[in-house]
């Protein structure tokens, strides 16, 4: 499920580390989280959409890899991001 331009710009602006930042791990994880949340809502209605579920699992895996990278590089940025996104309990 693609994100609209407005939603994507809002997420990028909210998590960017500097002006014009679209590639930092924080921005990438935030965008993936937004897409994952959208697909999660989609699956509540469409339980048998297995093809989209494959894409969801790929996105979750990619997000996990980015979070692992960020945790290795800078634990403080990782913890801040996890807290802002509400990913861990």
From Swiss-Prot:
Keywords for this protein: Ribonucleoprotein, Ribosomal protein, RNA-binding, rRNA-binding
Pfam family, one: Ribosomal_S15
GO molecular function per UniProt: rRNA binding; structural constituent of ribosome
Gene3D superfamilies assigned to the protein according to its UniProt record, in alphabetical order: 6.10.250.3130, S15/NS1, RNA-binding
GO BP: any one term: translation
InterPro entries, per database record: Ribosomal_uS15, Ribosomal_uS15_bac-type, uS15_NS1_RNA-bd_sf
CC terms in the record's Gene Ontology section: cytosolic small ribosomal subunit
Subunit structure: Part of the 30S ribosomal subunit. Forms a bridge to the 50S subunit in the 70S ribosome, contacting the 23S rRNA.
Known role: One of the primary rRNA binding proteins, it binds directly to 16S rRNA where it helps nucleate assembly of the platform of the 30S subunit by binding and bridging several RNA helices of the 16S rRNA.
HAMAP family membership: Ribosomal_uS15_B
Family as reported in the entry's similarity comment: Belongs to the universal ribosomal protein uS15 family.
NCBIfam families in UniProt: S15_bact (TIGR00952)
Designated name of the protein: Small ribosomal subunit protein uS15
Species: Acidithiobacillus ferrooxidans (strain ATCC 23270 / DSM 14882 / CIP 104768 / NCIMB 8455)
Source species taxonomy: Bacteria, Pseudomonadati, Pseudomonadota, Acidithiobacillia, Acidithiobacillales
């Amino acid at each position: 499920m693609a994100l609209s331009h407005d939603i994507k710009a809002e997420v990028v602006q909210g998590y960017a580390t500097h002006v014009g930042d679209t590639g930092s791990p924080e921005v990438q994880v935030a965008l993936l989280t937004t897409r994952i949340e959208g697909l999660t809502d989609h699956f509540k209605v469409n339980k048998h959409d297995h093809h989209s579920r494959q894409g969801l699992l790929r996105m979750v895996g990619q997000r996990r890899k980015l979070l692992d990278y960020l945790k290795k590089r800078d634990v403080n940025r990782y913890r801040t991001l996890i807290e802002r996104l509400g990913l861990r309990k």
